[in-house]
Amino acid sequence: MKVRVLVCAVLAIAATTFTPLAQQKAQNGDWPSYGRDPGAQRFSPLTQITPQNVATLERTWAFDTGDTAMQVTPLVIDGVMYVAAGDHIFALEPETGKLRWKFADQDMSRRGLAYWPGDAKTGARFYTGASNGRLIAVDVRTGELAPGFGTNGAVDLKASVSVDGGAGNFGLPSPPSIYRDVVITGGTNGEGAPATGRLYGDVRGWDARTGKMLWAFHTVPRPGEPGSDTWPLGAYKNRSGTNAWGFMTVDVERGLVYVPLGSPTDDFYGADRHGNNLYGNSLVALDALTGKLRWYQQLVHHDLWDYDPAAPPTLIDVRRGGRVIPAVAQITKMGLLFIFDRVTGDPIFGMEERPVPQTDVPGEWTSKTQPFPLKPPPLSRLTFDPAKDFYALTPEHASWCKNLWEKNQLVASGPYAPMPLGRDVVTFPSTLGGGGFGGVSYNPQLALVFVNVSNLGMMGRMEPRTDPKTGNVTYGKNSVTGGAYGRFWNPDTRIPCSAPPFGELVAVDVNTGDISWRVPLGIVDELAAKGFKDTGALTLGGSMATAGGLVFIGATADRRFRAFEAKTGKELWVTELDADAKAAPMSFLGRDGRQYVVIMAGGGHQLSRTKPAAGSNLIAFALPSK
């Protein structure tokens, strides 16, 4: 459902007057934000590394951050590399990895930093979050907390979203977005059922100099605000979720910030939230200076599967009907790639509401339809036919999977089928996608976006839960392997029970909506040793496209880092890392004239199956020195 609006669920905190400050464009050799540009295209204009020479790439240095499971993409600005990792921000010499300075604080964002260039009166700053709910500003020059921002260089993000003084958990796992002098934050606020002390998931804008809150957008509308009729009366109270825990992006020219919003809580049960539940599972476009809602598209109605859009909305240009349409591409956990006009919110290739199965859980509510783009087609598996889709490469694993199916009398369900009461079903995809938080990369010269997807199902059923104090009965998700996130694999080997490919890299032509090519992404080492080399591997992370005609990607649960030819999908280079790379790579031009490609080998994710499971090294590659 798409709506353009002139008014919205916004709390205006202060008048928005700003000193004019041009949004700086990246120097060709720099990488100044997570996606390189504010629109998260993840495209490097560098051309030194090409399909003809990429096979000679070699490891040039590694820096041990001391923290594992990091998903960070480092920044390079004016000849210095900056990386956030756990309890530290490091400034490095980018050609060597030599440490310049470090800043220490409590468990900061695992995915990176946001850079603000400052002005004549205020020096350049980095902004990041800490696990205790603070937004931190660090002086780029000194590596110390920025004076004048909030209290001692930090703002308490919990204060303005607490309910009756509640002290629930709140964090900022992804870097904020910045437009002019406004720092825009989302955050994590818990995924449990509504309860006293839960914190709201409001998106907020802050003065980059002082830390003063400028505006707040209510992601769950308050009574009387647009969208409140998609909730029961009072259902916003103590409601967590419906939050921007991933990446937001900015259209600098139009002053819009694009926000992918998460699922309302509880993730798998919604009897207390009848309705479509705006703005949960929506892509919303806000005025970056005021927080006013410009348009939205809800991508999942009344989510019962934890199918929140986790990826950055990527700004692209679509050439169609003789004109260039400014567009935004959003990949989802369902493996659906939605492409919208980023000014109006209209779907460029069409979108339709399709009938979906309904629930049998007492008191639950389900939407009769769910939205699907007409093009491109789904990029990952959405169905499972036990007659033809079982894993069958090796007898041991095939037997294990068949036994799992028959012993537990599993049944295959279709897209958006609610988990039934008392019997286990297999649904595709799982909560890990489809597409994940790494999102897409975009080559504007080829008009291609590149998407890594996983083909992994999940098992589940709904079962009653009785409150011992009140006797009230609610329902929660469980599975044959225990817990709400039962994945359709052997948990000891983490090999899926569905036929490969388990992971794929897909290229989509944004001018036509057609799939240009798709290839298996990754290997399973023990299967490759038996001759099965095209299985792909489960993926979690992101890619980078380059003007040199390449796509670089780690992301696979096989400890590898790869380069593909952008036009064809041919794998041209692969190297083994210290751990899985659940991050997105970047590239920069060193002062020595060499193009470098850098990836964080942090490992430690839900799909990892190699040893060591976690790593702490940031690793750089370049062509051999002449």
Please state what every model-predicted region is.
Residues V7-T17:
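Bacterial N-terminal signal peptides
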Residues V138, T142-G143, L199-M213, R273-K292, ...:
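Beta-propeller blade signature
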Residues W31-G35, D67-G86, M108-R134, G168-A195, ...:
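Repeat-blade elements of multi-bladed beta-propeller folds
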